[in-house]
Structures are given as C-alpha cells and as structure tokens.
C-alpha cells in the first residue's frame, strides 16, 4: 500500500503516475475531492485513490503538502516518508519527528485548481537510491525518475530556482517569463541565484548545474506559468517564503554569508502577507 498526503499539484502528479502503474494509493487530503481530474495535453483522467489514512500496511508515504504544514502530517506517516516539497526546512522538520524519511525533488510543472490538475511542463523526479522500489513504480507509470546517491545538491539547485523566480513573480504578479523579458527582474533573479550558490558552497554542497544558468533556462521553459508563490499572493494565501528565500537568509546568517537580495525579497513577501492578514 502507498499513501499520498496532499492532493495538490505534486500529490496529484504522483497519484497519476501510480495509477498508470496499476497502483491505487490511499490519499489523505484536507479539501476532499470525490473526483479529481489530471490532464495531460487536454486528455483528462479521473484519478483513482482510496480516501483515508487508516491502513497499516503502508510501504511508502509520499508527503506533498505545503512546507509550512510539515509538522501536521507526522501522525499520518507510515513506512518510508518521501517528502516532496518546495524549499529547505520542511523535510528537516519531518525528519526530526519521523526519522524514517527521505527528501524528493520534483521539477515537473503542474497547475492545480480545485479538483483538477494540469501538467504544464515535463521535468524529473529525483529520489535517493534507497527508495528504488518507488522509483520503479513511478517509471512504470511514465514518470521520468532519477535515482541519486546524494540528493542535497538537487534540493539546493531547486531552491536557487524557486528563490530567484517565485518572490519576484509574486511581487510583480507576472508569469515566469518576466525574468527573461525584464532586465530589472532578471538582474534581481540572478543576484538571488548567486547568493544561494554562495550559501551552498559554504555548506559544502556542489550543485549539479550552474544555478544562474538554470534560473534562465527554467524561466524561459516555463515563461507562461505563474509560480505557486505568485498564485498564493494573488489569493492572499499563506506562502512558503520562509522555506525558500527565508531559508537562504537563515543559512546565510548561520554561515556568515551575505544574502541581501534574498532578505529584501523575503521581507517584501512577508509584508504583503501582513497586509492580507490585516484585512
């Protein structure tokens, strides 16, 4: 038995691949969808899953909730917890409470609205080699999966991309392509990526690709997409900024590495959240 916690963009993607591999997972979701559609190039399929969280024979629990909800999922964890989230920090919170946990990195682009999700960009799922059985299932279902011995470099590369794109697009309320079309936005984004690289280097993490180049590649490839943070800000919803730019600032302060652009963007998003909370 496999369990998926959170039927958002990432949770629905995993469920889709599992379905295609012949697996019907158990799903724990906050907002219940009796019927959930997953669409690829206009072709929509109804996801198959069991509602609940009562099964005991769970081999893997895929955690796909927002990073700030990490602690709330701990009572639902069984087997190996595979934590697929944005940013740095959510996995660490889960690992502290539930040691049998590993991180995952997802670079697919999925847009979710209500009880429907749409694949908007094919990427990859990076998993630690310790969860090869899960990797085989996802591959059987059509997922592009890479098993890696050390997943930390991939976590930091994704952090660099998210930190460089999400906050800027949220503040501008513009799709990711603004990072390419606006020299001002691009300057900020590349400074953010360089700061993340500096922090990662101080930690001894060597990213698999140059984060500055990766930001430009991703922004171009997803030019029409609106980042999750931009959508959260537009909806006056809580963002994951504490685990994205906030995490860069936190690690930078601990290591004595300056992160002024990340700090400015972090503070601006937090100020925007405060405006929403004040009415």
UniProtKB/Swiss-Prot annotation:
Please provide, alphabetically and separated by semicolons, the GO molecular function terms listed in this UniProt record: 2-dehydropantoate 2-reductase activity; NADP binding
Q: Which residues hold NADP(+)?
A: 6-11, 66, 86, 240
Q: Where does substrate bind?
A: 158, 162, 166, 176, 225-228
Active-site residues, record numbering mapped to chain: 158 (proton donor)
Pfam families referenced in this protein's UniProt entry, alphabetically: ApbA, ApbA_C
Task: Please give the InterPro entries that the UniProt record associates with this protein.
Answer: 6-PGluconate_DH-like_C_sf, 6PGD_dom2, ApbA, Ketopantoate_reductase, KPA_reductase, KPR_N, NAD(P)-bd_dom_sf
In what pathway does it function?
Cofactor biosynthesis; coenzyme A biosynthesis
Could you tell me the Gene Ontology terms of the biological process aspect for this record? Answer: coenzyme A biosynthetic process; pantothenate biosynthetic process
The alphabetical list of record keywords is: Coenzyme A biosynthesis, Cytoplasm, NAD, NADP, Oxidoreductase
Q: What's its top-level EC category?
A: oxidoreductase
What GO CC terms are in its UniProt record?
cytoplasm
Q: What is this protein called?
A: 2-dehydropantoate 2-reductase
| UniProt organism field | Pyrobaculum aerophilum (strain ATCC 51768 / DSM 7523 / JCM 9630 / CIP 104966 / NBRC 100827 / IM2)
């Amino acid at each position: 038995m496999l369990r998926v916690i959170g039927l958002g963009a990432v949770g629905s993607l995993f469920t889709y691949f599992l379905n295609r591999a012949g697996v019907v997972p158990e799903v724990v979701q906050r907002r219940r969808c009796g019927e959930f559609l997953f669409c690829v190039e206009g072709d929509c399929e109804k996801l198959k899953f069991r509602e609940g969280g009562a099964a005991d024979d769970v081999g893997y629990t895929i955690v796909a909730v927002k990073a700030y909800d990490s602690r709330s999922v701990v009572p639902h964890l069984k087997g190996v917890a595979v934590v697929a989230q944005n940013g740095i920090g959510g996995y660490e919170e889960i690992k502290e409470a539930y040691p049998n946990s590993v991180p995952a990195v997802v670079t697919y682009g999925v847009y979710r609205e209500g009880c429907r999700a749409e694949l908007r960009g094919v990427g990859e799922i990076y998993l630690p080699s310790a969860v090869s059985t899960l990797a085989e299932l996802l591959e059987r279902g059509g997922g592009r999966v890479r098993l890696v011995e050390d997943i930390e470099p991939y976590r930091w590369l994704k952090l660099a991309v998210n930190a460089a794109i999400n906050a800027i697009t949220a503040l501008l309320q513009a799709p990711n392509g603004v990072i390419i079309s606006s020299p001002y936005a691009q300057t900020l984004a590349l400074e953010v990526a360089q700061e993340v690289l500096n922090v990662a280097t101080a930690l001894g993490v060597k990213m698999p690709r140059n984060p500055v180049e990766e930001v430009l590649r991703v922004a171009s490839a997803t030019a029409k997409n609106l980042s999750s943070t931009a959508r959260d800000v537009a909806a006056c919803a809580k963002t994951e900024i504490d685990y994205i730019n906030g995490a860069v600032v936190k690690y930078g302060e601990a290591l004595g590495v300056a992160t002024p652009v990340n700090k400015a963007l972090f503070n601006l998003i937090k100020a925007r959240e405060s405006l929403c909370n004040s009415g």
